C-alpha cells in the first residue's frame, strides 16, 4: 500500500466512524500520485471506488475538496509540504497530526526505517500544542504491528504521546 492510500484510508476511517465532524485536511506529495507520465497511484479511481466525490469544478485536478457520500465531514486534499500528511480536528478539541508511510507485507523490512522516519518527522515537523496528538500511520503488516506494539510501550514515546495507526487494505484501522 502506497503512502497516498494510507493517507486517504486514515482520513476516511475517521469520517466513517464519526470521529470528527470537521473537514479532514490531507497533504499528498504529487510524486506519490504521478511522476511524468507514470501513474503510481490512481487517486481518481481510488476516490470513486471509496465514495469520494469531488466538490469543486476542476475535475481534472486531484487536489481539492471531496465529499464522502452520506457523511457530514469532507476531505480537503492538497500537496502542501510541511503541514503533516493528515490533520484531523476531534470533538474534544484535540488535533491529530499524522505522518504516514507506505509499506508492503514482504521480506524487505521497510517498516523499521520508514516508521523511524515518520517519528523523526513528527518530532521536527511542527510545534505540538497541548491538544496535538502525534500519530504514525502505516499499512498493517506483521512487522509494523510488532514495532508499533513495542515502541508504544517506550517511556519516550508515551511522554510525547505518539500514537500508531495500522491501516488495512479493507479500510479498517487499529489504533495503538
Language-model segments: which ranges?
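Nucleic-acid nuclease catalytic cores
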Residues: 126-171
Amino acid at each position: 500500500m502506497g503512502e497516498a492510500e494510507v493517507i486517504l484510508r486514515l482520513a476516511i476511517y475517521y469520517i466513517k466512524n464519526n470521529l470528527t465532524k470537521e473537514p479532514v485536511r490531507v497533504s499528498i506529495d504529487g510524486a506519490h500520485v504521478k511522476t511524468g507520465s507514470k501513474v503510481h497511484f490512481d487517486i481518481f479511481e481510488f476516490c470513486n471506488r471509496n465514495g469520494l466525490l469531488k466538490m469543486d469544478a476542476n475535475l481534472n485536478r486531484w487536489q481539492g475538496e471531496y465529499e464522502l457520500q452520506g457523511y457530514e465531514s469532507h476531505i480537503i486534499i492538497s500537496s502542501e509540504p510541511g503541514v503533516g500528511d493528515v490533520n484531523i480536528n476531534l470533538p474534544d478539541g484535540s488535533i491529530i497530526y499524522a505522518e504516514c508511510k507506505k509499506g508492503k507485507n514482504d521480506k524487505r523490512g521497510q517498516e523499521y526505517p520508514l516508521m523511524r522516519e515518520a517519528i523523526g518527522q513528527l518530532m521536527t515537523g511542527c510545534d505540538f500544542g497541548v491538544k496535538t496528538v502525534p500519530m504514525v500511520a502505516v499499512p498493517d503488516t506483521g512487522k509494523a504491528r510488532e514495532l508499533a506494539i513495542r515502541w508504544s510501550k517506550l517511556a519516550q514515546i508515551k511522554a510525547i504521546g505518539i500514537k500508531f495507526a495500522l491501516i488495512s487494505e479493507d479500510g479498517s484501522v487499529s489504533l495503538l
